[in-house]
Curated annotation (Swiss-Prot):
The gene is rps4. GO terms for biological process: ribosomal small subunit biogenesis; translation. HAMAP family: Ribosomal_uS4_B. This is Small ribosomal subunit protein uS4c. NCBIfam families: PRK05327.1, rpsD_bact. Part of the 30S ribosomal subunit. Contacts protein S5. The interaction surface between S4 and S5 is involved in control of translational fidelity.
Length: 201
């Protein structure tokens, strides 16, 4: 299954707020309607929608998400928590959480167009797995700096998670540590996602 490229509002109307996909928010009326529908949903539907929320927020294909679930299952610790940590440490998500892009799809575009450096080297792979002490910067060209500065200027500093530090005037972000799950940028029940896949095998 390919990455979703359809209307964003259609997805948030059904699944709720997905900040990685779009800055738009569902209306109060839609949220109330979803809550009423939620009480009538089957357990399968609830698990499916949690999985879809994760997939659309991080902009993954079905195959990519399944791969992350399998890697998480082989790691030490809670599969759900490891899954969220892996997704949060993707370069496209880090760029988004630093405020260098408005959404994850936009961050992915910046990376694909080679505007982003990790530790002084161009990285053009959005799924690149970042690690503590990595330094993320805009390429030393005016176009790259202008693109990223536009978003840094408007990004709310109070929403910056505690595992990241940003230096807007240097077009630079630093990863301090692996993310604590309470700072994950999406309201999600990751255990339902793991359960969804465990029942598919």
């Amino acid at each position: 299954m390919s990455r979703y490229r359809g209307p964003c509002f259609k997805k948030i109307r059904r699944l709720g707020y997905l900040p990685g996909l779009t800055s738009k928010k569902p209306t109060v009326k839609n949220e109330l309607r979803n809550q009423l529908r939620f009480s009538k949903k089957s357990q399968y539907r609830i698990r499916l929608e949690e999985k879809q929320k994760l997939r659309f927020h991080y902009g993954l294909t079905e195959r990519q998400l399944l791969k992350y679930v399998r890697i998480s299952g082989k790691a030490k610790g809670s599969t759900g928590q490891v899954l969220l940590q892996l997704l949060e440490m993707r370069l496209d998500n880090i760029l988004f959480r630093l405020g260098m892009a408005a959404t994850i799809p936009q961050a992915r575009q910046f990376i694909n167009h080679r505007h982003v450096l990790v530790n002084g080297r161009i990285v053009d792979i959005p799924s690149y797995r970042c690690k503590p002490q990595d330094i993320i910067t805009a390429k030393d060209e005016q176009k790259s700096k202008t693109l990223i500065q536009n978003y840094l200027d408007s990004a709310p500093r109070d929403k910056l998670p505690n595992h990241l530090t940003v230096h807007p005037f240097q077009y630079k972000g630093l990863i301090n540590q692996i993310i604590d799950n309470k700072w994950v940028g999406l309201k999600i029940n990751e255990l339902l996602v793991v359960e969804y896949y465990s029942r598919q095998t």
